[in-house]
Amino acid sequence: MKPSERRKARHCATQAIYQWQMTRANVGDIEEQFKIDQDTKGVDLNYFRDLLFGVALHCNELDKVFAPFLSRPLEEVDMVDKAILRLATYELTRRDDVPPRVVINEAIELAKAFAADDSHKFVNGVLDKVIKTLNKR
């Protein structure tokens, strides 16, 4: 598998997680609709599925990991930022095959692609603190 396939999986998963956060629709339905509506060529679909279902299943647990490092209440965090933080925290806590620096770099790129102008700085700061508490340097 190429790194770009995982990057594309993260890209797609961020969009699908955002949709799930907004609608709370069935994750399996979101996955199927996403595969129909989006170009998934070159996407690691197994990784996409793991990220989407993993974040949905462990959402509250993931929030508890990064919420202490937020500068505002979780409810006030932009939904795109929240999707990225949940995805990255899932990778940091549940995917030992991905180095922490890769997780942070990918999250920064997702924030640059999808979120507000300075969101990448916010995401970087929160995840850096998460890594320190997980002792994953």
From Swiss-Prot:
Pfam families: NusB. GO terms for biological process: DNA-templated transcription termination; transcription antitermination. Keywords: RNA-binding, Transcription, Transcription antitermination, Transcription regulation. Coiled coil: none annotated. Gene3D superfamilies: NusB-like. GO terms for molecular function: RNA binding. InterPro entries: NusB-like_sf, NusB_fam, NusB_RsmB_TIM44. One of its GO terms (cellular component) is cytosol. Signal peptide: none annotated. It comes from the Bacteria. HAMAP family: NusB. Involved in transcription antitermination. Required for transcription of ribosomal RNA (rRNA) genes. Binds specifically to the boxA antiterminator sequence of the ribosomal RNA (rrn) operons. Belongs to the NusB family. PANTHER family: ANTITERMINATION NUSB DOMAIN-CONTAINING PROTEIN (PTHR11078:SF3), N UTILIZATION SUBSTANCE PROTEIN B-RELATED (PTHR11078). This is Transcription antitermination protein NusB. It comes from Aeromonas salmonicida (strain A449).
